[in-house]
Amino acid sequence: GIRDSSTSRGLGDVYKRQPLPGATILIVGTNNGTTTDFDGNFTIEASQGDVLVVSFVGYTTQEVPVEGDQLTISLALGNLLEEVIVTTGYGTQSKRDITGAVTTVEADELLSVPATTFSQQLQGRAAGVTITNDATPGGEATVRIRGFGTIGNNDPLYVIDGVPTTSPGNINPNDIESLQILKDASAASIYGARAANGVIVVTTKRGKVGSTQVSYNAYYGWQNVPNDLNTPAMNAAELGEYLYLADYYAGKTPSHGQYGFSGTPENPQISIPNYVFPSGANSVDESLYSLTPDNIYAITRSADTNWWQTLTAQAPITNHQIQASGANEKSQYAFTANYFSQDSPVVFVGYERATIRLNSSTKVLNDRLTLGENFSLSLDNRKGGYGNNSEQNAVSGSYKHHPLLPVYDISGPGGNPYGGFSGSRGLNLGNNFNPYASLSRNQDDRSKRFRALGNVFAEARIADKVTAKTSFGFDVVGRRYLDINRPQPEYVEGNFITVSY
């Protein structure tokens, strides 16, 4: 039969010599096999010299040669969990000794996804953790651990190399060795009320024992968006036909401030004007402008604009990293320098980040005292004024702006001091702003952030398995914004005069 002969490594003797029902026995090189019964016994037809492969969940698989008619096989409890070390708030523990809900994500899993932040890379890699991406370059993802716990702030606490912080921004994902996600209430015993929404413990890379390792890594790629939305937008003629039929089946005489309607519902005739005239303009000469005290609004030539394709383009993404690390029995060090750049598929928008990280530690006093530090400096720059948190953002404008309207008025690109953009100040054209004009005018906006994050620590070994550690951490963030509000005379609800910085 098969019995468990050893439960060493701290598990105790409670399972010693207990039968293992349901274990699998196979003859190597064949499909012949069987399983053990409730008492751990089995019968299998095998020849002398055959090798049996014996396996059981949680135990080390063993190969046993057939010698004689009777075999008693002992399996040792697998030590897989014992070899997994998890970083928690108090320090490190064997995974099998942890009673709380902890999920570990290794660096290889994170780096399989090229992303701006490690919170974006976490998506789909930890049960009970929900990630909602910002969808803008440099935007931080919204992380929720086991749902919402309050109507207020539900963000988890981040602990980066021992420094608690509320923001994972500016952290280079390539610097991360592993992540531990503490999901249950036990985290509050370490970090208090700050851990009410869970804790994400980030451990950065350290030097490995051996000779100095120097490496350079880079990648280049690009992001694309579909040429059309899932449901392609109507062109100018299709929209005109739709408006004609909408009026007709509503019991009204089809009419529109721009289109000309004739024909029948079965064969509607839609005429598109040569020019779109602003409300109040004389439709006499294409060079005429409508003048009011606070607005100058140009006549525009009718178009058939696909606004989605106008606002999007292929966007490159680039990453460069230099890394040097090394260690011996007494000390270790690791240094990285990284540059990351990402353009948005939405035109005139981008993000770039530069980071430097250094950590080192050394043992003194006959290895009874360890001294070390972790330092990170980063500077990131968000370019352009696109945001997706308002009704009037450019992407929503792409499907609300009328296809009759071109990007520019009859003066053309740069034809006047305000860009020469066309607008919707005309009958039945809505009040939406020109989304391309908005992105173009905001392309010089900047949001820069400098961050210094790190700590210094000392750890004393008092006795075997007893240590005391103290650390001093800091997280300093400085921000600088450039926000230019330029005139937008073509916008129905815009103000022609106001300019601010």
Regions of interest found by a model, annotated:
Residues 73, 125-127, 173-215, 312, ...:
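A beta-strand signature from Gram-negative outer-membrane beta-barrel systems
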Residues 313-331, 338-340, 436-483:
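Outer-membrane beta-barrel transmembrane strands
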Residues 96, 208-303, 344-349, 355-453, ...:
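Surface-exposed loop/interface segments of Gram-negative outer-membrane beta-barrel transport/assembly proteins
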Residues 31-41:
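Short, acidic Ser/Thr/Gly-rich low-complexity loop/linker segments typical of extracellular
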Residues 1-15:
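Short, small-residue-biased leader/transition segments that mark boundaries at the very start
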Residues 43-45, 119-161, 177-178, 188-208:
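Extracytoplasmic beta-strand/coil segments of soluble accessory domains associated
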